[in-house]
Amino acid sequence: MSLLIKNCIVGKDKCDVAIEDNRIAQIGKNIKGDFDEVIQADGLTALPAFIDMHTHLREPGFEYKEDIASGSLAAVAGGFSTVCCMPNTKPVTDNRYIVKYIVDRAKEVDL
């Protein structure tokens, strides 16, 4: 799949962004080529991803509200590449053992 985003704002510049095989292949002005899809993005800002510094994943202890898997999948669907989970868990995330548990669970989700 190839995609060309035309006339978007990247930083302070208006330019095109070419994406091939889910990776940014080129950024520049007036990119030419045969693309599967072309999006006219006049006046829109292109960002690669977002970071959520205030995420309530609730695992361990409150998985019935949200867990690492469901919260991570929702974050990816919303364009977030990184989330930082709040310590409102049971037990509270206040030591390395709980942090290790969360990191291990995140690896299991494998996004």
Kindly give the residue locations of the regions a language model identified.
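Divalent-metal coordination cores built from histidine and acidic residues
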Residues: 73-111
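Redox-cofactor binding/interface segments in oxidoreductases and associated redox assembly factors
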Residues: 40, 52, 85
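Residues that line or immediately flank small-molecule/substrate-binding pockets and catalytic motifs
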Residues: 12, 54, 87
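Short catalytic helix/loop segments, enriched in acidic residues and glycine
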Residues: 25, 67-73
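Conserved, mostly hydrophobic/aromatic
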Residues: 43, 54, 75, 79
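Di-metal (Zn2+ and/or Mg2+/Mn2+) metal-binding site signature of metallo-dependent hydrolases
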Residues: 44-69
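Short secondary-structure boundary/hinge segments and terminal tails
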Residues: 35, 68, 92-94
